[in-house]
């Protein structure tokens, strides 16, 4: 059977008419080398810094090095399936993480994937892990306190909502415990917490999550993990992912707290990546942009004003604000705060809480050195009652330290000096606090009031801790309305002072602490 040329033309015309061309242009390249989670890609001609690159098997990489003919990228997760010649496709998007309120109470990895075995999390939206910090015009003055529950911090080194306060000290000095207690203290507030674990053992993280559960603090907390067994790429990414989760709450007009534990390991992970990418090393083999690494992360923690929220949410109350408070942790070696990473982060943050091994080993917990611990926000981040009652504590402790040094060279001391030494010892005992026992504003105010108004003069140093315990029990049992009033109004006046004095005098008649 023969087909004429006209029939052939007609068949071809029908086929062409039915043919649906779906064209999609994308930029692709090929892997030319793979080593230690770093891939070198040839052929990607149009790529952004930090862009997400698509790999086979639903995996992704982030472009970090942009050279003339080659792009250097870090693989997020396993890279054993990637070989020379593997096709890489650019996505045109910065790396994003799922965010939402349903992440509260869950443990996730750096990519936002749950690792606690409780099932999938329904995200509300996706946010870039790298985003510019709010500008100066968008920021609100820090004026509201974020209570840690520690007398020594809330009295001497107050932290405000939107502040960046560094926790620094040697290993095993209670840095993580302090941060976890701060999270626990937010259980009765509306503050959402994010704990970022960088380069830690899984056993440590499991114990930490269990402590949060036991203290009813996991429901308002997100734990985001890049453990020591995971790649340097994930350890580098995880604080930025955690920050995006915190910004989600901040930009809804809520208050959030984020703990980075710790940025020393984060810097080491970034150094490893930079050396593998053959970037020129600088001081301590860290790359030249190590300061910018932490600056762009910590600058995202702030308190934003109502105009900023209005641009995001539409209509808001003119007094509405949102905040993200950061508590970065840095581990020092043998108390050396002058090394590269500690000095960098000290210069970025709004103050530091310095924990000393000597104080920790001598039984002073938290082991805060009041001499070099400072909050650059100061009294603006304290409620009125704590600000008034704590005004003389730092001075008294400084005088005590001077007198201790002086008394070592003098065998005879006058009565005034002896009384100052005893008062200083009592203050140190008062500022001691057990782990997982944060205090309310009223409880702190009661103890500080007793110390500042000479109610401890007839209490020996050895009896201080028991005196404090029994005094708080007496208040909570017999004067719960006064305690509730102080917690609600957070102010002190002549009436409150008289009420406190009367109750403490009534308590002292019982002599139940001796």
Curated annotation (Swiss-Prot):
Site feature: Required for activity: 373
Enzyme class: translocase
Entries under InterPro entries matching the protein: ATP_synth_asu-like_sf (IPR023366), ATP_synth_asu_C (IPR000793), ATP_synth_asu_C_sf (IPR038376), ATP_synth_F1_a_nt-bd_dom (IPR033732), ATP_synth_F1_asu (IPR005294), ATPase_a/bsu_AS (IPR020003), ATPase_F1/V1/A1_a/bsu_N (IPR004100), ATPase_F1/V1/A1_a/bsu_N_sf (IPR036121)
Record-listed ATP binding positions: 169-176
Catalytic activity entry: ATP + H2O + 4 H(+)(in) = ADP + phosphate + 5 H(+)(out)
Any matching Pfam family: ATP-synt_ab_N
UniProt key word Nucleotide-binding: yes
GO cellular component: plasma membrane; proton-transporting ATP synthase complex
Topology versus the membrane: Peripheral membrane protein
Lineage: superkingdom: Bacteria
Similarity field: Belongs to the ATPase alpha/beta chains family.
Quaternary state and interactors: F-type ATPases have 2 components, CF(1) - the catalytic core - and CF(0) - the membrane proton channel. CF(1) has five subunits: alpha(3), beta(3), gamma(1), delta(1), epsilon(1). CF(0) has three main subunits: a(1), b(2) and c(9-12). The alpha and beta chains form an alternating ring which encloses part of the gamma chain. CF(1) is attached to CF(0) by a central stalk formed by the gamma and epsilon chains, while a peripheral stalk is formed by the delta and b chains.
Record's protein name: ATP synthase subunit alpha
Highest classification ranks of the organism: Bacteria, Pseudomonadati, Pseudomonadota, Gammaproteobacteria, Enterobacterales
